[in-house]
Amino acid sequence: LIESEMIKKNGRYYLDLDNLENKMKGNEKVVILCSPHNPGGRIWTKNEQIEVAYFCKKHNLILIIDEIHNDLVNPENKHITFPKIVDDYFQNFILMTSTTKTFNIAGGLMGNVIIPNNSLRDKFQKANFATGETPNRFGMILGEVAMRSGHKWLDDLLKYLKKNKDVFDKEIESIKYLSSMRIDSTYLAWVDFSKTGDSENDNYKKL
């Protein structure tokens, strides 16, 4: 497992594919991309996602993309799902989504997996069938109803979350040495304690 630290610039996270490439040993098989990013909330741009696709194709890597937060995007932002960007250029990816985060129905234990590469999809299906697991019927119904009828509810939720974020950011900025990262998506917050001069454990105890 290789961990590639992102670059923090102007209070935002950016991918560092050069750093990742320098750490590679040549036996890597998979790259995992969280899009939008959790917990930093970054929505990767079209160009950033294209760069990841080029990187994976160059090194013959399977790209696993977690887009579970793709619906929880601030009203003023837009998330572009990976398949719409790469078209037929790069098909060696596994895209995972779910309605569970967006509609708070994690108890349904349901998700979606999209694999355009036929060979890779066959391998995935065989491995999945071998587990003996079957889809959760209740979860399937929950997900379908949410996708078909939940648009108005989701629009209201996103506006509500944006107001919460604005209030949270304002209050955090009023606290000396703390700053809140600007979040494009998700319902999470990411606060920088580095200027306090305290250790991670000390800050944890204070919280």
Indicate where each model-derived feature is located.
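PLP-dependent class I/II
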Residues: 1-207
